[in-house]
Amino acid sequence: MNILSLRLKNFRNYKEAEVSLSPNINYIFGENAQGKTNLIEALYVLSLGRSFRTSHLTEAIFFGSSYFFLEMTFEKDGVPHTLSTYVDKHGKKIFCDQSPIKTLSQLIGMIPIVLFSAKDRCLIAGAPSDRRLFLNLLLSQCDPQYKHSLSYYHRALLQRNTLLKTKQTSTLSVWDEQLATLGSYLCLSRYTCCAQLNQLIQTLWNNSLSERLFIKFKSSLIKQCKISQEAVKNELHKQLTASLHRDLELGNTSVGPHREDFTLMINDLPVAQFSSEGQKHSLLAVLKLAESLYIKSLHNVYPLFCMDDIHAGLDNQRISQLLGLAPSLGQTLITSTTLPHQTLSEANRIFSVNQAQISIHSHAIIK
């Protein structure tokens, strides 16, 4: 799968722009606030139906305009397709090959994408909800059943919480059964995902200090090393029953996958407390590379790999390592304030961005 071109209209600081992309590395450089990150954001919105910078897509509309329009052409299994998103104050419309996409479940996974940016610091120091979102987006791009289970789990959770707030307990058992069935699939999927990410991290994390980097998944539902969905379902059902009195007092559900979390660890110590800022950024880069390889292992296609502001927090040695890995990661977009310090082959493309004007800097080898 390759994205062939991207078109933007009334998006952020772009009144209108179009860019053709290389199937390999696309290196985009320019001063700050010129529109580099906006290109990655546009691809993210097209791929996932949401932004990584705002929860309100209308904030991305060009000043003075009433809408924005994004369109990409991409090739999948040798067949060209068009995907577009239109947003105005009334809502969002998404089309693939002129056919409407009515739900995000239909969209997510069509164009798998991995983003590495400064906002990923939340995976170390942010709230548990940030880390659950990371797993939810990753698994939703790979597993249609996970998307379905997640959607229906939150619906059932909302219904149960409504009953708890109004002290209506007569039908709670119905929702407990749904939560246990759906929640067990979510929990087991996350547990398995973290285990597989850890294997990939160990392959990627290579340093002279022999430090061990891994994800520690935290769930009250995991009671033993060898688990099954039935065992997790029974455990969640038991915990929902045991916490009923407390839940009635709180007016919400205190146990389940919506309370799960994970911690990035290095040598059995939390990265958040025992790593330098530069080391944290390097560790996150490894996690994001593992995320890309995880999607490849399930999709049999590399996701679009985006690295925003690559020089923020990474030294030249680590950047060189990332760029060395990039050709084996499929199509990649990188933004930076400077030109690369190492050679990029003719198969790649370098763009400069200045005041929302995109130009091809060179197709040639740069040293």
From Swiss-Prot:
GO terms for molecular function: ATP binding; single-stranded DNA binding. SUPFAM superfamilies: P-loop containing nucleoside triphosphate hydrolases. Pfam families: SMC_N. It comes from the Bacteria. Keywords: ATP-binding, Cytoplasm, DNA damage, DNA repair, DNA replication, DNA-binding, Nucleotide-binding, SOS response. PROSITE patterns: RECF_1, RECF_2. One of its GO terms (biological process) is double-strand break repair. GO terms for cellular component: cytoplasm. InterPro entries: DNA-binding_RecF, DNA-binding_RecF_CS, P-loop_NTPase, RecF/RecN/SMC_N, RecF_2. Gene3D superfamilies: P-loop containing nucleotide triphosphate hydrolases, RecF/RecN/SMC, N-terminal domain. PANTHER family: DNA REPLICATION AND REPAIR PROTEIN RECF. The RecF protein is involved in DNA metabolism; it is required for DNA replication and normal SOS inducibility. RecF binds preferentially to single-stranded, linear DNA. It also seems to bind ATP. This is DNA replication and repair protein RecF. It comes from Chlamydia abortus (strain DSM 27085 / S26/3). The lineage of its organism: Bacteria, Pseudomonadati, Chlamydiota, Chlamydiia, Chlamydiales. The gene is recF.
